[in-house]
């Protein structure tokens, strides 16, 4: 069988240039597909690659590709470069709920360091707050953000992860494991839904399940 490699001189030249010119602790951010190339030819760390998709990197990088808010994208990249997914993981260790931890993470990303500190002190102590802030607001290493033409055809994939709605996922988990009464109570207490709104959603989900 004939085999045409995906790597080419353009890629090698670009990545070799990064290897020659980038700071030793520089990080390359991109979609995961070519992460192993980046590590080999550029000899730098990457956000994630084919061997490191066990956390939420796909959501955060997907979001940077999707968002029209440049400040949000920069804040996400700083967070990833400062500590990978440790910021959200530490918040999760406090609230024990993925939807809540991601929601808080997005809120922190939109705040100044001083305001973020105040927000974190609502849920944890001073020393833990200081640790978490470092994962959001360290002096980040040099950052290379790589996009390539093939990513246009892959947009359905990174957009799927980047636009993942954690609240909807949580609602579906409640639906799968509860009857209508428990479902409604969960949405009221956890997500501030009204009775009628929660009941309507339950029966909409039931109809979808039946249609399948």
Enumerate the language-model features and the residues they cover.
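Extracytoplasmic
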Residues: 1-212
């Amino acid at each position: 069988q004939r085999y045409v490699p995906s790597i080419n001189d353009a890629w090698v030249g670009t990545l070799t240039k990064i290897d020659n010119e980038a700071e030793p602790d520089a990080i390359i951010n991109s979609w995961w597909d070519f992460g192993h190339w980046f590590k080999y030819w550029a000899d730098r760390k990457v956000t994630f690659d084919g061997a490191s998709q066990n956390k939420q990197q796909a959501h955060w990088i997907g979001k940077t590709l999707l968002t029209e808010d440049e400040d949000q994208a920069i804040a996400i990249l700083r967070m990833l470069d400062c500590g990978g997914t440790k910021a959200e993981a530490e918040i999760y260790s406090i609230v024990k709920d993925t939807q809540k931890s991601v929601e808080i993470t997005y809120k922190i990303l939109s705040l100044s360091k001083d305001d973020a500190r105040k927000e974190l002190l609502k849920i944890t102590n001073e020393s833990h707050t200081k640790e978490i802030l470092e994962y959001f607001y360290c002096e980040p290493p040099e950052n290379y953000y790589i996009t390539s033409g093939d990513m246009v055809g892959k947009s359905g994939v990174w957009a799927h992860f980047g636009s993942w709605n954690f609240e909807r996922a949580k609602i579906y988990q409640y639906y799968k494991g509860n009857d209508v009464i428990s479902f409604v109570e969960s949405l009221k207490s956890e997500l501030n839904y009204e009775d009628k709104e929660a009941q309507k959603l339950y029966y909409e989900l039931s109809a979808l399940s039946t249609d399948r």
